């Protein structure tokens, strides 16, 4: 499998598609497809904040990559008519970096921190007073000359996004008034996203083609958009005016994306679990080592979708393959073996 195949189902953004994602992003809640429960709740919170002429409460968005956390943050800013400043946990290395960002904010602005779980502890602690009471105290100087400088801040909204909510400290997590767990998208929503994206691309797609794309996109909008771009290439070269189910199937087979959206890494994981560990239980570190990945990649990029479609289970003793996984791989299943 070459590098391109490995990237095709990566739910994290690829460098050369970041600009194209901007053209696909909805601007307002009414345009945002999926995550209905979250949208319904946000609609109430946004309306109430605007009626009171207050900044929206701080928001934590968590869930697997590619589900639209950054997009939703931008939508929230648009709905509030607020300016948004975007950064990431790894980009804020020192407390001074954070203070500089906070000092640029005006009343009602939004600060979006992606990968907020990767903030250094010292930086995170500065956020506590900023979020709760809208001020920061910074100690300058050393020894007898050390003194604190008090920086009042305007009311602002912090939106944090993370794929690893469990890695957030309790004090930080508790300061978010709005917490939204973003779920994998059902096929019906992904089909709508595929149709919307095709329209933006001025590309014709049949309902059957959109449905097949949706089924093989791992419940992830970013992936359905990426696959649509690749399938569009195959259709164009083949001289097809409309993307139908057959074109999608032929293209994705060539890209090593199977009927359930699994790639070679997923299949290697399942085959290792079934053949080498007799279906499990097996520890994630052992599985990751056997398939040549690190455990963080396996936990963040491989296992969430396999759990979602019911191909594996997490147990106190480790990962286990389910009967559905055996059936998908066409391996005889024996009760009690896994």
Swiss-Prot record:
Cytoplasm as a keyword of this entry, yes or no, is yes
For the ligand (Mg(2+)), the binding residues are 70
Annotated residues that bind ATP are located at 24-25, 66, 69-71, 132-134, 175, 185, 222
Q: Where is this region: Large ATPase domain (RuvB-L)?
A: 4-185
Catalytic reaction(s) noted: ATP + H2O = ADP + phosphate + H(+)
Per the UniProt record, which EC number(s) apply here?
3.6.4.-
Compartment list: Cytoplasm
> Its domain of life?
Bacteria
Q: Where does DNA bind?
A: 314, 319
Q: Mention one GO biological process in which this protein takes part, according to its record.
A: DNA recombination
Report which residue ranges the record marks as coiled coil.
none
Pfam families named in the record: AAA_lid_4, RuvB_C, RuvB_N
Assembly and partners are described as: Homohexamer. Forms an RuvA(8)-RuvB(12)-Holliday junction (HJ) complex. HJ DNA is sandwiched between 2 RuvA tetramers; dsDNA enters through RuvA and exits via RuvB. An RuvB hexamer assembles on each DNA strand where it exits the tetramer. Each RuvB hexamer is contacted by two RuvA subunits (via domain III) on 2 adjacent RuvB subunits; this complex drives branch migration. In the full resolvosome a probable DNA-RuvA(4)-RuvB(12)-RuvC(2) complex forms which resolves the HJ.
Purpose of the protein: The RuvA-RuvB-RuvC complex processes Holliday junction (HJ) DNA during genetic recombination and DNA repair, while the RuvA-RuvB complex plays an important role in the rescue of blocked DNA replication forks via replication fork reversal (RFR). RuvA specifically binds to HJ cruciform DNA, conferring on it an open structure. The RuvB hexamer acts as an ATP-dependent pump, pulling dsDNA into and through the RuvAB complex. RuvB forms 2 homohexamers on either side of HJ DNA bound by 1 or 2 RuvA tetramers; 4 subunits per hexamer contact DNA at a time.
Q: Which PANTHER family match?
A: HOLLIDAY JUNCTION BRANCH MIGRATION COMPLEX SUBUNIT RUVB, PTHR42848
Name of the featured protein: Holliday junction branch migration complex subunit RuvB
